[in-house]
Amino acid sequence: MPRSTPRASFLQNSLKKAPFAGLFRKLVTPARHSEGGGKERLYMRTLALDIGEIRVGLAVSDPAGKISTPLKVLPADVVLNHGTEFRRIVEDWEIEQLVSGLPMTMAGEEGPQAASIREKAQKIAKACGLPLFFCDERLSSREAKRILREEGLDERAMRGKVDMIAASLFLQAWLDSQM
């Protein structure tokens, strides 16, 4: 459960008394989705990690777990060492689970870097105390580059953006698979 700051507590208490308190509860209460037979599933905000040697691309889901959005690219050592900027993202976005891209071959088997990525992702998840899932990231960087080229960016301008776009692409695929 995310920690509540004094400011957040004040806002929550003030808004609970307001005429639109019901709307406020809908906005701050995690969404529930009824699956056949009345079974409800609680959605969680998810952070995707596209882990590279130099950079880690980050993407985040909406609270309902339906839409992914590119967020940021951080130096790999900041994320791997659970640096201040990464911790702030996890706390501010109230992240409840992580999804890491896993490099797969075209045959659907784990690629040569998969073991290293798996180890790094597990280290990050352990430091955050969050559950970790893996997702096939096959061709996500290539698709991210294609999207950025269509937007008119050259290779140099793409450099920092490809990783977060790729993270958003495989996070969206993972979110869709959870529905």
Predicted regions and their residues:
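Cationic, amphipathic, low-complexity segments that mediate targeting or membrane/lipid association
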Residues: 3-23, 29
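Short, Lys/Arg-enriched N-terminal segments with co-localized hydrophobic residues
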Residues: 19, 33-43
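Generic early N-terminus positional signal peaking at residue ~5-7
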Residues: 6, 48-49
